[in-house]
Amino acid sequence: MRAYTSLVGHILGSHPEIDGYYEMHRSYMLADDLDRQLGQYAAHDALKPGSRLLFDKLLHNDYTLNLALPELADATLLLALRPPAATLPSIVALFAQKDRDDLYATPEGATAYYVDRLAALAGFAARHPGRFHYFDADALLADTPRLFAALERWLMLETPLAADYRRFSQTGVAGAG
């Protein structure tokens, strides 16, 4: 949610152990959803030889995650937030670009959206303590080496992350988040 997730996704997706870099707009409620995610990703981008992680972003409350699935038992979840002073104008600007009038294109609508998202994330965190790693999104720009070290540790990467990243088939495509 306006927390540099496109940049994070591209940095992670450029790593040889990680496939995926964009928002796939899906929930993960059944094991079949994970297979569909893999198929959806592979339809646009080749899977890397030796990759072991598949990345997605769940940026909105519309998408749910069933952590009771055995297939997600060892999933690594990352939560990132950006302060409201930067996030709210970004939400307004994003939704003001849409072709239709959008509630989130106003400061009031953006604030309601942000508060709802925070409440959903707080609820998720309360229900799943110890199942996620949190970082301040601004650390990506303000303290990149420390954040990269934490991400490498959390994801158990064998090689370091790099600030340079690839352009992929869905880079810059509207709706790919």
Which residue ranges define each predicted feature?
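Short catalytic/ligand-binding loop motif for oxyanion handling, primarily in non-cytosolic enzymes
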Residues: 4-9, 28-30, 63-65, 86-90, ...
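PAPS-dependent sulfotransferase catalytic core
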Residues: 1-52
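Lumenal/extracellular "mature" regions of secretory-pathway glycan-modifying transferases
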Residues: 23-31, 35-36, 97-113
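Conserved phosphate-donor/acceptor-positioning beta-strand/loop module used by diverse small-molecule
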Residues: 73-93
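The conserved 3'-phosphoadenosine-5'-phosphosulfate
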Residues: 126-177
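Glycine-rich phosphate-binding loop used to anchor ATP phosphates in small-molecule kinases
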Residues: 47-67
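Soluble or luminal CAZymes and related metallo-dependent hydrolases
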Residues: 36-37, 59-60, 109-117, 143
